[in-house]
Amino acid sequence: MLDRDGFRPNVGIILLNQRNQVFWGKRIRTHSWQFPQGGIDRGESPEQAMFRELHEEVGLHPEHVRIVARTRDWLRYEVPDRFIRRDARGHYKGQKQIWYLLQLIGHDWDLNLRATDHPEFDAWRWHDYWVPLDVVVEFKRGVYEMALTELARYLPRQDFRNRFLRSNVRAREFERHMPDGGAPAGLDLPPGGSFDPHPDITSASDDPSPPPHNKAPFLPSQR
């Protein structure tokens, strides 16, 4: 289902823990990390699609989260031609997304990457709010920055430190707002989780590797 400009309707999910760190998932059998996202089916509202994708990709139910905010309008990104199936080129351009900011009100152990028989992720971790901009595949960076920036105003004050990081405030200016001890706190490793200590993306070709069950990203009828 494409709009007249060739963009597929989609939802993106930024899931916060109690420390305002964001869920960051590794796509199954790839080295690519990203936020949960997925297409809006015909007849679905963006919110209905968001809750469906939340369960399919992360294993959470509506009672596990609180909706903090969503983007006001569609945010778009174009997919490079080399990642689009040849028979879709010329009429499919990319994704248009509504982004949701969610607060986890359950526990880390409520997350389940195997909630369905077609998992999207095979590992996950918590990251500080702005870190994904440094590691997401290049053609998604713009839409990630727009979503994170628009939704950052709804973060509790405890994320003040991360805003300095994103603004490239360094040295003395940043240190004035840091607790004694200097470096930002380390990541929480949830029980039973599987983690890649270096989730860096080395090339754009890592991102679009299709997962099983034909849920390949970036195709008009797919994710």
Swiss-Prot record:
Q: What class of enzyme is it?
A: hydrolase
| Motif Nudix box, residue range(s) on this chain | 38-59
Coiled coil (residue ranges): none
Segments for region (Disordered):
175-223
Stretches with biased composition (Low complexity): 180-193
Q: Which GO terms describe its molecular function?
A: metal ion binding; pyrophosphatase activity
State the source organism's domain of life.
Bacteria
EC nos:
3.6.1.-
What are the UniProt keywords, alphabetically?
Hydrolase, Metal-binding
Q: Tell me one Pfam family matched here.
A: NUDIX
Query: What InterPro entries would the database entry show?
Result: Nudix_hydrolase, NUDIX_hydrolase-like_dom_sf, NUDIX_hydrolase_CS, NUDIX_hydrolase_dom, RppH
Query: Which cofactor does the UniProt annotation name?
Result: a divalent metal cation
**Nudix hydrolase domain mapped to chain residues:** 6-149
Q: Does the keyword Metal-binding apply?
A: yes
Q: Which family does it belong to?
A: Belongs to the Nudix hydrolase family. RppH subfamily.
Described by its record, this protein's role is as follows:
Accelerates the degradation of transcripts by removing pyrophosphate from the 5'-end of triphosphorylated RNA, leading to a more labile monophosphorylated state that can stimulate subsequent ribonuclease cleavage.
The protein's matches in NCBIfam families, at most eight in alphabetical order, are given as:
PRK00714.1-2, PRK00714.1-4, PRK00714.1-5
Protein name in UniProt: RNA pyrophosphohydrolase
UniProt organism field = Variovorax paradoxus (strain S110)
Q: Give the encoding gene's name.
A: rppH
